[in-house]
Structures are given as C-alpha cells and as structure tokens.
Amino acid sequence: MLEERRLEVLRAIVEDFVLSNEPVGSKALAERHNLGVSPATVRNDMSALEEEGYITQPHTSAGRIPTDKGYRLFVDRLSGVKPLSRAERRAIQSFLEGAVDLDDVVRRSVRLLAQLTRQVAVVQYPSLSSSSVRHIEVVTLGPRRMLMVMITDTGRVEQRIIDSLTPVDEEIAGELRATLNCALAGQRLVDAPEVVATLPDQARPELRPCLATMTGAVLESLVDRPEERLAMAGTANLTRASVDFADSLRSILEALEEQVVLMKLIGSARETGTVTVRIGRETDVDALRSTAVVATGYGRGPFALGGMGVVGPMRMDYPWTMAAVRAVAKYVGELLGAD
C-alpha cells in the first residue's frame, strides 16, 4: 500500500502532466504543490513510485510521466468527479431539451459530449432489447397497401409498407390498429414476437389474412433492422492529441470505425449513474492501447437503455470528463423518460 504522501505526489504528477504534456520534475512539483516536504523527499517518493510502476521516465534528462498503472490508481483512489456548475448543468439541459425526436436527441448528445470533453464521443441508440411498444399506427395507402408505424417508449420509430393479399379499407385498418395496440402496447420488444405469433388465430376469419401479413411485418421490423445503432462525433479532436498516441492515429481511427469495437467499449455500460473508465490495455483493443474510454449508461431507473462515452488519450482530465459524461447521460435519460 502506498503511503498517503506518495499518493499525493502521484496525483500532482498526473494533474501537471495532463495540463502541460511535459514530464514532471521533483523541483517543479515541490514548488507548485503544497506537499509539505522538500524537493529531495519528493524525489525519493518519485523513485518509489517508479519502482512500483506508477510513473516512468521517458528519457534520462526528463522528469516523470504517469503509466497506465498510475492513471488507474489516480482514477480509483485520487480523483473525484468534479461537480458541474449550475450554469453548465443548465446549458446542457437547455441544449438537449430542444431536441424534436430521438434522432435529434442522439445527435445533440454526441455533439455536446464531444464539445464538452474535446474527445471522440459515442452514443448508442436505445437498445431494442431495453425498449417497449408505445403505439402502433396503421394507415391505408391504397386498396391493398398499408403503412405500419411502430413507436417505442424511447422514441424509436420503425416503419413498414405492407402489401395485403386481400382488400383493405379504413375500417379494416382501424381494426388492425386496435388489435395490435391491445396486444402489444406496453410490451417489451423482446417479448413481442411471442405475443404477435398467436394474434391471427384469435381474429375473426375475415381479418386473419391481413393480420397475418401485419404481424409478419412487425416481426420483420424487429429482426431486419440492426439491433444496435451508434452515433459518433469529434474524431477531429484526436488530431489535436496525436502526440499522445504511441500507435499511429490512423490505426486508432480505423478501430473506431468498427461498430463491434465501439459496442464493446460503450454498449457494455449497463448501469445508469455509474461511470466506468478503461485505460490503455484495459480496452482489450490493440489499436486503442494508447487511449482511455470513459462510459456510462443512460435511461430510466438503474438499468440502461443504452450507453454513451468518450474515447481519448490516456492524458485526459479524468474528473471533468467523468462529470461531463455522467451529466449528459443523466439529462438524456430524463428526456427519454418523459411522457
């Protein structure tokens, strides 16, 4: 267990390096921070921290910089989440409240997160597995053609144009609408296939062909559309921090283009209010071993509808980044949870 003073020295090294991007020396630490000890004592503490693998010396004439292990200890033991000011919280809330639909909520959220943190921001659309049916609308488009619109409780909209084998009119469309809403409104989407499978057999004979076609469309809308969608913003922010990456910036950008990689990093945040931080090799992605990922879930209650977070260099302001991610997630969850 490190002594408290050495923890303070590590905290000071991380904060100074994040701010300056320059190796930190013992004399500068003693002058800038109220550590209560001499530069010689600070130097001894730094030597101990280096032996433990928390800091390293990039070259012989330089000071020290944090390692992956040092950043990990800083996040776990030393950094608190900075509280946002009332003005900052109000600005976030006002910007998000201007959204007109789910796509706009996601677009605004990912842009805002990228601007606040100056990192690459990623927001996952509400997962189908976490959503429920709010309403189904059926509209006639012609004698044998209908439009089916399914709206989830998170604002996700799925549309299908359906060609019927039998003629349809407004009366039939209304009956289909009523039947589907009676059976599915409030149902979780993951439970919907089992529910709709039995509907045609329960309908009056004249309605069964249309209802069978309609329930097939409902199933297709759940199966054919990708389960998970992501939005990303702020990739240009990586270029401003290119000196922080041991690997080429190109390999990092290529990794971020892979949805499966992003889902692994962001979509795994399944709890609201809990911010997770993966540093360096903890990302389990070779191309991202020079980066850090800060993520959390958003939604109503303790379980997340989706995840959001940022990807940036390990040399980031963790307390501020964690606060920004948590704040945006909180307001997005409240917005999507509003009736």
UniProtKB/Swiss-Prot annotation:
Gene3D superfamilies: 3.30.450.40, Heat-inducible transcription repressor hrca homolog, domain 3, Winged helix-like DNA-binding domain superfamily/Winged helix DNA-binding domain. Keywords: Repressor, Stress response, Transcription, Transcription regulation. InterPro entries: DeoR_HTH, GAF-like_dom_sf, HrcA, HrcA_C, WH-like_DNA-bd_sf, WH_DNA-bd_sf, WHTH_transcript_rep_HrcA_IDD. It comes from the Bacteria. The keyword Repressor applies. The keyword Heme does not apply. One of its GO terms (molecular function) is DNA binding. One of its GO terms (biological process) is negative regulation of DNA-templated transcription. Belongs to the HrcA family. PANTHER family: HEAT-INDUCIBLE TRANSCRIPTION REPRESSOR HRCA. Negative regulator of class I heat shock genes (grpE-dnaK-dnaJ and groELS operons). Prevents heat-shock induction of these operons. This is Heat-inducible transcription repressor HrcA. It comes from Frankia alni (strain DSM 45986 / CECT 9034 / ACN14a).
